């Protein structure tokens, strides 16, 4: 009996060992090509599975004991060996490096310098023992699953491309199958001119002397020799510079006849502002002349020297969006060249674009009243037209009359001032104008700056001042004139931003007038004027942060309901059972008496 059990145990072990051997199956997965060099013999699991884009880290790779493997496989073509007689960096197939193990010297091997390898992997639990003739590894992925992988040496990436045979019979078929878009054999049809230039469009020029439309040229180097090509057009809004040489066999004859050496050939034309100007060449509003930014003299042959030849051309082009080109200027740098056979000249061509700006007198930068929020005590900034200044109040002289000098309104500071005005005019309209100018100052403020660093060019940083002049219809007197005698400037402001660093800004402002009627055409009158400024803080304080809610344990009113119900039900049951017992005893007693 023991012998039979021993035989059965040996049979099971043999069956398990046979099934554990690596067999080709549908569960094996081939991984794409990766670059490797030589095998590593230690059998240690790795922490990363083989990837299709990266080479598996050579941690666990076993080799047969008697196998002979070339650790530096020779390739028929070494694509990275670009320097003869010199070792190219990271080129593992370069024979000039004379390295047996290139990876020990290089940080990596360039693609194409080593043979590709593919991996076939199965679950590691299926493997009992491996006797594969190929290098093997055990990988562990991030989820902890281990895989047993075998590297094969016949990767498809090492196969050669199929060479196409081209002859007169299949030439057209191959060109149609693999060919793409090419240059059109016929020039495209002429399209109607667009309304405005787009970035990269060639710039149109017009020569009035010959009535010819051409393009603004920017010669550039072309070909292996880098000679100047005149046909290169300048692109709209593409600021760039080009450099190219010119060679002259006979400079003596070319000195005065070659257009490329004459500065006049670079400005004796007009530039079209927009492409649609080509439809009306007689309309000068679509054309911009090329102006000279520097003096340029014509070429001159003096003895053995060619003088005043162009060595640099600089175009400055100002554009204004869809309105096109507004101004074109050109400047030159000229030099002299000695006449000799095969002489050369290096020329530079620069085209620079910039935005068109109306020329204005530069105004000094006004000081800020804060950055960005207003600072208390700094002037309140106002705007009239495009001019920024500070708001002012009346100022009186020693005799009480209104002075030409005025007090500046300081942000956050309430103030009041007054003076006596002796009008020079007696006409009502002129009198009203004089009084208004005295109250407001000149010029009259129209907008107030929201922040202390407001820019006059940015209208979004200013808010209009609300005002309403005195109503003439409110006076019934025909010979009376209604004039303002008091001006109250109300400024609403608030803090913005963090409470630790608040920024004051103006939310709005208005002028409030108190009016008075005076007799028209009355000479020698004096009018008492008053101005006051009032700053109102409308800052809304945020709600203070609340504490964490405190725990207030309260039991519901029916928390003990189940227990009460059970107790009440138990009492009723006890009461019913007592009644039942009494009934049984009573029946027993009656039965005993009847017997």
UniProtKB/Swiss-Prot annotation:
GO cellular component: membrane; nucleus
Transmembrane residue ranges: 576-594
Primary localization class, coarse: membrane
Compartments it resides in: Membrane
Record region (Disordered): 23-62
Keywords: Apoptosis, Cilium biogenesis/degradation, Glycoprotein, Membrane, Signal, Transmembrane, Transmembrane helix
Membrane topology, Cytoplasmic segments: 595
Sugar-modified residues: 167, 336
Compositional bias ranges of the Polar residues kind: 49-62
Any single biological process term in GO: apoptotic process
Membrane topology per record: Single-pass type I membrane protein
Topology Extracellular: residue spans: 23-575
This protein's record includes keyword Membrane: yes
Signal peptide coordinates: 1-22
Organism domain of life: Eukaryota
Subunit structure as annotated in this protein's UniProt entry: Part of the tectonic-like complex (also named B9 complex).
PANTHER family for this protein: TECTONIC FAMILY MEMBER (PTHR14611), TECTONIC-3 (PTHR14611:SF4)
Similarity-based family: Belongs to the tectonic family.
Role, per record: Part of the tectonic-like complex which is required for tissue-specific ciliogenesis and may regulate ciliary membrane composition. May be involved in apoptosis regulation. Necessary for signal transduction through the sonic hedgehog (Shh) signaling pathway.
Record's protein name: Tectonic-3
Source species taxonomy: Eukaryota, Metazoa, Chordata, Craniata, Vertebrata
Designated gene of the protein: Tctn3
